[in-house]
Design a protein with these regions (language model features):
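Mid/C-terminal beta-alpha module of Rossmann-like enzyme folds, strongest
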Residues: 201-265, 277
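Active-site Tyr-X1-5-Lys
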Residues: 131-155
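Substrate-positioning beta->alpha
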Residues: 166-171, 184-207, 214-218
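N-terminal Rossmann NAD(P)H-binding glycine-rich loop of SDR-like oxidoreductase domains
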Residues: 3-23
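NAD(P)H-binding glycine-rich loop region in Rossmannoid oxidoreductase-like domains
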Residues: 36-89, 93, 97, 114-117
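Conserved Rossmann-fold NAD(P)-dependent oxidoreductase catalytic core, especially the SDR/UDP-sugar
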Residues: 92-135
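Flexible, glycine-rich beta-alpha linker
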Residues: 116, 153-171
Length: 280
């Protein structure tokens, strides 16, 4: 079996590559955009191919070599044009070519952010209408449709932490530090997943005998965590200082507006985002 990983040097993609190469009987190819990224994989003994997900010729050649494609490509910034270019046009191209060349299994790593701001408590898959707010989440919701229509499997982790995380815990601690307080004693409940647990599940889902064609799954740790639990653990593991004060959410919203903080991120850490989930 040959597995092609798109976005093979990103946070999740690199962990997927490590998972694949640690397993016997699996040939793994990393699809990357630059020579430097290809050399990074080659130094670790991993085959690499260079291309762009919006450039059909290179993508077609790469996909023709694989029976399974795991797509870890995403743009999560605020540039709407880039969101459309990568998450909408790029993933549509991936889904189309996967179907055209006969890829047997296509798996796309999406996000539970497609549901919108919450609050959510024990939400099953598609237990609420999708109401994505940011350009990144809106275009990733569209990407999901392209993948499912091509018979692919969509996995929705929520907040991913672990080695290489440059978004979730850094954002959480930066906001709390700017506020110099936790919000509502850090009582908000969040679905989270360690990146190594996530990619282990991705591997199992991509190789199980009965592939879940055209399906969507929540893949997170089954028991959600409180914000204060996450912060206390981070403080113990690092030199970060956890503020000892707490403010109500309503006050935090006002202070955040004065500080110019992103209100979507305030919602993320002060409202429950608990998705009924499991690991595989």
């Amino acid at each position: 079996m040959t597995t092609l990983v798109l976005g093979a040097t990103g946070f999740i993609g690199s962990a997927v590559m490590n998972q694949l190469v640690s397993r016997d009987g699996n040939a793994a190819i990393g699809f990357v955009r630059t020579d430097s990224a290809a050399k990074q994989l080659s130094r670790n003994g991993i085959a690499a191919t260079i291309g762009d997900i919006n450039e059909s010729a290179s993508l077609r050649v790469a996909m023709s070599q694989a029976s399974t494609v795991i797509c870890c490509v995403s743009y999560v910034g605020d540039d709407e044009q880039q969101c459309v270019h990568v998450n909408e046009h790029g993933i549509r191209n991936i889904a189309s070519i996967a179907a055209a060349v006969g890829v047997e299994r296509l798996l796309y790593v999406s996000t539970a952010a497609v549901y919108g701001p919450g609050p959510f408590r024990d939400l099953p898959v598609n237990g609420a209408p999708l109401k994505p707010l940011s350009p990144a989440s809106r275009t990733r919701a569209l990407a999901e449709e392209f993948v499912r229509d091509a018979g692919g499997l969509v996995v929705r982790p929520h907040l991913v932490y672990g080695p290489g995380d440059r978004w979730f815990l850094p954002t959480l601690t930066r906001i709390v530090s700017r506020l110099d307080s936790v919000i509502d004693n850090g009582s908000a409940i969040l679905s989270v997943v360690d990146v190594n647990l996530l990619v282990r599940s991705i591997y199992k889902l991509s190789t199980e005998q009965q592939f879940r064609y055209g399906s969507t799954l929540h893949v997170n740790e089954p028991v959600p965590r409180t914000v204060i639990d996450l912060l206390e653990h981070h403080a113990r593991e690092t030199n970060w200082t956890l503020p000892q004060s707490s403010i109500p959410r309503a006050d935090a919203v006002k202070v955040a507006a004065q500080l110019g903080l992103d209100m979507h991120k305030i919602d993320m850490i002060s409202l429950d985002h608990w998705f009924r989930s499991r690991l595989y």
